[in-house]
């Protein structure tokens, strides 16, 4: 309801007459993005910072209300402002032919590009690019991802489609999508959200293989324990830790001497907000001994094995 009212207000601001037959944006669809596609989009977007990058999305149209994005691939275009260059048709054709040889028979259902640091919305050039996609596929989608605002556990991403100025087909009935769409930002509203284009709900699906892939993404291997640092690096690390232990020892000795000068009723609050040298000294000694014991055993094992 809020998005409908905002759309009507936006059209009224443009001087359009509001009637009962005025078509509203169709936001009933849901885009299901696979984990592989999401990871590849984020990796490509972060590699291109501070420039914008773009790519194409491969997937399938499940039904009238569901679009599934299975995979993506990067395009050689990049941009320096809030827009990217046009699509390279030669590169796109060659890439699709090579993907078909690997078993990727999905069609191009849209494109994605990055907005590093300034949110998810479409510029005027992006709207024109999206309209060119919709001429080939009426249900094409434009996905925008912000790699700088994205943090672990929360990805700043949104999907858009342009609003037809003079639709010929009757708009279909849709259900409420309240709670599924992201709240629009002020910057997106200024740049034409709900006026030139509208947002589409995004969902993330994970099958059994994708769950295993995500679990093994940063999984450590047992062979990492056999890796030995350089002797010069290890010597410098030991020297730094020993100097730190010497400094903590002096602080601990000074704290013991100061305890005799402090009144008994003030001893409980005298150490509040200060570094506890005794606790840090014990922790650093255990860490230093454990690291050196593990290193000696690793060097002995490597010498005998190799």
Swiss-Prot record:
A motif (JAMM motif) lies at residues 113-126. Metalloprotease component of the 26S proteasome that specifically cleaves 'Lys-63'-linked polyubiquitin chains. The 26S proteasome is involved in the ATP-dependent degradation of ubiquitinated proteins. The function of the 'Lys-63'-specific deubiquitination of the proteasome is unclear. Zn(2+) binds at residues 113, 115, 126. Coiled coil: none annotated. InterPro entries: JAMM/MPN+_dom, JAMM_MPN+_peptidase_M67A, MPN, RPN11_C. Keywords: Hydrolase, Metal-binding, Metalloprotease, Protease, Proteasome, Ubl conjugation pathway, Zinc. PANTHER family: EUKARYOTIC TRANSLATION INITIATION FACTOR 3 -RELATED (PTHR10410). PROSITE patterns: MPN. GO terms for cellular component: nucleus; phagocytic vesicle; proteasome complex; proteasome regulatory particle, lid subcomplex. SUPFAM superfamilies: JAB1/MPN domain. It is an enzyme of class 3 (hydrolase). GO terms for molecular function: metal ion binding; metal-dependent deubiquitinase activity; proteasome binding. GO terms for biological process: proteasome-mediated ubiquitin-dependent protein catabolic process. Belongs to the peptidase M67A family. PSMD14 subfamily. This is 26S proteasome non-ATPase regulatory subunit 14. Pfam families: JAB, RPN11_C. It comes from Dictyostelium discoideum. Its EC number is 3.4.19.-. Residues 31-166 form the MPN domain. Component of the 19S regulatory cap of the 26S proteasome. It comes from the Eukaryota.
């Amino acid at each position: 309801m809020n998005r409908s009212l905002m759309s009507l207000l936006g059209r009224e601001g443009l001087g359009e007459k509001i009637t009962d037959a005025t078509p509203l944006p169709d936001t009933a669809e849901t885009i299901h993005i696979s984990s592989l596609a999401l990871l590849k989009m984020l990796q490509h977007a972060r590699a291109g910072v501070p420039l914008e990058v773009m790519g194409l999305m491969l997937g399938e149209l499940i039904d009238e209300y569901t679009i599934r994005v299975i995979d993506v691939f990067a395009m050689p275009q990049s941009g320096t402002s809030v827009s990217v260059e046009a699509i390279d048709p030669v590169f796109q054709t060659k890439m699709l032919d090579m993907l078909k040889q690997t078993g990727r028979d999905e069609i191009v259902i849209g494109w994605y590009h990055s907005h590093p640091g300034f949110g998810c919305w479409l510029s005027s050039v992006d709207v024109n690019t999206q309209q060119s996609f919709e001429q080939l596929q009426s249900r094409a989608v434009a996905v925008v991802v912000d790699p700088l605002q994205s943090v672990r556990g929360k990805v700043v991403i949104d999907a858009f489609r342009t609003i037809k100025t003079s639709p010929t087909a009757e708009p279909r009935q849709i259900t409420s999508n309240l709670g599924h769409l992201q709240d629009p930002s002020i910057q997106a509203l200024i740049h034409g959200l709900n006026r030139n284009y509208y947002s589409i709900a995004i969902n993330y699906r994970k099958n059994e293989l994708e769950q295993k892939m995500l679990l093994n993404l940063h999984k450590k291997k047992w062979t990492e324990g056999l890796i030995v640092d350089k002797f010069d690096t290890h010597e410098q690390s030991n020297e730094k830790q020993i100097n730190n232990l010497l400094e903590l020892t002096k602080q601990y000795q000074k704290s013991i001497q100061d305890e005799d000068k402090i009144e008994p009723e003030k001893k409980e609050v005298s150490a509040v907000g200060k570094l506890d040298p005794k606790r840090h000294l014990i922790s650093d000694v255990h860490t230093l001994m454990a690291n050196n014991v593990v290193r000696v055993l690793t060097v002995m094992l490597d010498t005998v094995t190799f």
